[in-house]
């Protein structure tokens, strides 16, 4: 799984693996077998790679079954029909086998595109932001379906996305990209709880940023003292606090105190906009996300505690 912002090189990486772009430097290998380098390139059709495009790219003049069968040229007619039946059944689209793509919804077309890409049993399965064109409900349904299909397959899969939550849901290993380079690789929980820099931390959700200075291995902030091991005294740092790390408590004694600016129910969670006194006009503006319904009135005062595993300290960007 490879998340990253637009323009970081995600799609180009997929196209290089698939053989749709020429390498200018380096090489592409699979199990020590070189697919491409600067001197030679294996043709795309020889690589046993399937690429699921963001825009589905179904053939409008072919039926669903004909679209799925398109890449199965090395099979007999009976084998081809059996494989088409199998993959359409996997994605729940068997009853649409004789329809044309124009009569299908976006979610249905995506299922057909998934079936077509899976049909040849590729050794490498590439997916280019496959769910980005779908509404939230359909996106969640198809992500779940795709995850189960990919887990059961014998292919190695690489999915690129700009959605960090999708990367955490779909990926066993996640490689974060920025400006054409991989910044950090690891399982989702490692990237979420142990990001190597502020970019990775902020990629996996909103963060509150607090500037500070290290003293005796700690940073003193308006919301509490944060451990900052490995930094020299006087070092300028940025403290990043996830909204869910700010826990709202009724007891203000021995806790940081915040004034409620506004509160909003987001369904399964509530988002609170808070102001914490910091000696400046307006105070320090922070966001807290709490589970369930918690809607303190505007102007009320609440106490704050911190969940340390969702608080990170990095060298200030301008230092």
Language-model regions, residue ranges each:
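Non-catalytic connector elements of ABC transporters
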Residues: 207-209, 216-319
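Conserved ABC transporter NBD signature motif
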Residues: 26-37
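ABC ATPase nucleotide-binding domain
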Residues: 39, 46-51, 55
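ABC ATPase nucleotide-binding domain helices that frame the ATP-binding cleft
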Residues: 11-14, 112
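Conserved coupling/switch loops of ABC nucleotide-binding domains, chiefly the family-specific signature
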Residues: 24-27, 179
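ABC ATPase nucleotide-binding domains
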Residues: 48-50, 58-199
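Helix-to-loop junction immediately C-terminal to a conserved catalytic motif
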Residues: 18
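The feature captures the beta-strand-to-loop junction immediately N-terminal to the Walker
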Residues: 3-5
């Amino acid at each position: 799984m490879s998340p990253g912002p637009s323009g970081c090189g995600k799609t180009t990486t997929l196209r290089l693996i698939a053989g749709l772009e020429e390498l200018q430097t380096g090489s592409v290998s699979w199990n020590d077998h070189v697919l491409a380098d600067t001197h030679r390139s294996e043709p795309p059709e020889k690589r046993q790679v399937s690429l699921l495009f963001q825009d589905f790219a179904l053939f409008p003049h072919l039926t669903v079954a004909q679209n799925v069968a398109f890449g199965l040229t090395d099979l007999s007619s009976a084998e081809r029909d059996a494989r088409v039946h199998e993959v359409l059944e996997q994605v729940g689209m068997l009853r649409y086998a004789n329809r044309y793509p124009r009569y299908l919804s976006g979610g249905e077309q995506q299922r057909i595109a998934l079936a077509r890409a899976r049909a040849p049993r590729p050794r490498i399965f590439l997916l280019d932001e496959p769910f980005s064109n779908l509404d939230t409900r359909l996106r969640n349904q198809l992500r779940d379906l795709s995850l189960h299909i990919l887990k059961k397959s014998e292919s190695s899969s690489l999915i690129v996305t700009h959605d960090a939550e999708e990367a955490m849901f779909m990926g066993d290993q996640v490689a974060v990209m920025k400006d054409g380079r991989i910044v950090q690789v690891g399982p989702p929980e490692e990237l979420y709880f142990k990001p190597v820099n502020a970019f990775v931390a902020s990629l996996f959700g909103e963060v509150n940023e607090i500037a500070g200075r290290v003293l005796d291995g700690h940073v003193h902030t308006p919301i509490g003292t944060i451990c900052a091991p490995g930094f020299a005294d006087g070092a300028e740092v940025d403290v990043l606090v996830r909204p869910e790390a700010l826990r709202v408590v009724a007891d203000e004694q021995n806790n940081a105190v915040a004034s409620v600016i506004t509160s909003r129910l987001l369904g399964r969670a509530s988002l609170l906009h808070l102001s914490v006194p910091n000696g400046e006009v307006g105070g320090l503006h922070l966001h807290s996300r709490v589970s369930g319904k918690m809607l303190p009135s505007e102007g009320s005062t609440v106490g704050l505690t911190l969940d340390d595993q969702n608080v990170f300290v990095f060298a200030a960007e301008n230092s």
